[in-house]
């Protein structure tokens, strides 16, 4: 995989803005040691994620209104794209907001159609419709160059956004990136099970993150998702890409991020693995790694611009 860096243990350099350490990538010192910083030195965004920004709504003709929260600030802006049926108030979304506040960077987080405070019927939502949601946020709300941070399904959608808006999307950060995830999981089912789902029209997909223990996904949603698969050919994204993944992820195997890295055309791609992290990657060390990765990209982009 020429140009692809696989780093289970990032190295560190002093950060110019708030005195801790920012991530660089390569096989160097142990990550657990490097992340074991004293809490008293941690920036405010790591100590507490305060939910202060007011909710706004993006009105769209013939499409559901989208709930969002926005911080005005400098470029590049950051947009957080949540996971499947996740809203904009998750741990990662709030931590990134506090990080952006501390540096004065623009930031947007939002709810998909049919999720959270946004309008729309979840049962009618598809990968294609959520892709349109992301593009609406980029086109109608974001100003200037943007770093997209996608979690799980959001990681799949961020690649579609980068392909559709290459002039505006300048870097990608994926967390447990689930490119083609819905289709891949369905295709791994036994033939008899797939036939039964097709006949009934609903897939009760098991999930420990659902209160019912399953997500009820329409068969039509799975078939529609097939039109948005990316792993069957080179992914035409040329910007810097960072893919963070937990090796204990039992929803989207970490090998998926390696496969994505291999498919991406960009030569500036790093896969960063956390040995003991799960799919959600929401522990303190995971969040530190995420924001340090974003900070490193901001540094990199500033160097390129200037």
From Swiss-Prot:
GO molecular function: hydrolase activity, hydrolyzing O-glycosyl compounds; mycophenolic acid acyl-glucuronide esterase activity; palmitoyl-(protein) hydrolase activity
Domain AB hydrolase-1 as annotated: residue spans: 78-177
Keywords, ordered alphabetically: Hydrolase, Mitochondrion, Transit peptide
EC number: 3.1.2.22, 3.1.1.93
Organelle transit peptide: 1-52
Location of the active site: 152 (charge relay system), 249 (charge relay system), 279 (charge relay system)
Disulfide-linked positions: none
Subcellular location: Mitochondrion
GO cellular component terms, semicolon-separated: mitochondrion
Taxonomic source organism: Bos taurus (Bovine)
Family according to the record: Belongs to the AB hydrolase superfamily.
Protein name (database record): Palmitoyl-protein thioesterase ABHD10, mitochondrial
Gene Ontology BP terms: protein depalmitoylation
Catalyzed chemical reaction(s): S-hexadecanoyl-L-cysteinyl-[protein] + H2O = L-cysteinyl-[protein] + hexadecanoate + H(+); mycophenolic acid O-acyl-beta-D-glucuronide + H2O = mycophenolate + D-glucuronate + H(+)
Pfam families per UniProt: Abhydrolase_1
Gene name per UniProt: ABHD10
Regulation: Inhibited by palmostatin-B.
Function: Acts as an acyl-protein thioesterase that hydrolyzes fatty acids from acylated residues in proteins. Regulates the mitochondrial S-depalmitoylation of the nucleophilic active site residue of peroxiredoxin-5/PRDX5, a key antioxidant protein, therefore modulating mitochondrial antioxidant ability. Also catalyzes the deglucuronidation of mycophenolic acid acyl-glucuronide, an active metabolite of the immunosuppressant drug mycophenolate.
